[in-house]
A protein has these predicted regions:
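Extended, Lys/Arg-enriched charged tracts that mediate electrostatic binding to polyanionic substrates
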Residues: 143-162, 168-169
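Short, conserved beta-strand segments within well-ordered enzyme catalytic domains
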Residues: 124, 153-155, 172-174
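Residue-level preference for alpha-helix termini and adjacent loops
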Residues: 112, 122, 157, 232-234
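Short regulatory "switch" loops immediately downstream of catalytic or recognition motifs
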Residues: 127-132, 158-160, 177-178
Length: 239
């Protein structure tokens, strides 16, 4: 019953992007005292860690010949330098194009404001496998168990309805992998889109970055129109 309530009610909540209540200095007269700096200790791996794949292995898997309309499924075990090497999209230069293989576009039933970016999500389940719904003892903590080799892709783009253009900023991949010891884990990869020699290419950039972005569009839910730009759109560090 809890899950049904969540699924049927949350999409009806209004979208609110008014930042005014969060401008503490203007609204309440002062900002909160800053928190002490966070010191992150040096990373210490836990358990048995597989050696990193060799450059030769990465090159072999990422540059493999792939049939038209299929994804490069075998490459899920490595971090390809370019997003197009996974063959996830029908148009390698457009992550909003139809997905290859068994890719299934999906949307979330909860709203998440992402700095005026438009988001595209696609789930790729390996052939012969399936994602299994786990009811979590029949409560709101239900989850989906994805098989090894699953790739979840999420692209952030900026839309200009006046010019009828859309610019892809980044595509994030989450890939389910397995160690030689049988441990399952998810790896997050950050790909940043660039234009080179008239072509759009997304490069693996785990350290993230900063870019300029502009938007001009109307929200289909609220009807509100948003227009603006920034020179400091932050592309996240994958770590």
């Amino acid at each position: 019953e809890d899950l049904i309530d969540i699924v049927t009610s949350l999409p009806n909540f209004p979208v609110d992007t008014d930042i005014t209540p969060h401008l503490c200095d203007e609204t309440y007269g002062s900002n909160m005292a800053p928190l002490p700096p966070i010191v992150i200790p040096e990373f210490e791996p836990s358990g048995t860690i597989d050696p990193a794949p060799s450059d030769a292995m990465i090159d072999q898997l990422c540059n493999a010949t792939v049939a038209a309309g299929e994804i490069n499924a075998a490459a899920y075990t490595v971090d390809c330098p370019r997003l197009d090497q996974y063959h996830l999209f029908a148009d390698a230069e457009d992550p909003s194009s139809l997905p290859n293989g068994q890719g299934v576009p999906f949307v979330m039933n909860t709203k998440l404001f992402s700095d005026y970016a438009t988001k595209y999500r696609v789930a790729y389940i390996p052939k012969g496998e399936q994602a299994i719904y786990r009811d979590g003892n029949d409560n709101a903590n239900a989850a989906i168990l994805f098989p090894v080799g699953t790739i979840l892709a999420k692209t952030f783009s900026f839309t200009n309805e006046t010019n009828q253009t859309e610019v892809a900023a980044e595509t994030r991949l989450i890939i389910k992998r397995e160690t030689s010891g049988g441990q399952y884990y998810w790896d997050g990869l950050e790909y940043i889109w660039k234009e080179e020699n008239g072509e759009k290419v997304a490069y693996l950039t785990q350290q993230g970055g900063v870019m300029s972005a502009s938007w001009d569009y109307s929200d289909v839910k609220s009807g509100d129109h948003y227009q603006g730009s920034t020179d400091a759109y932050v592309l996240p560090n994958a770590n």
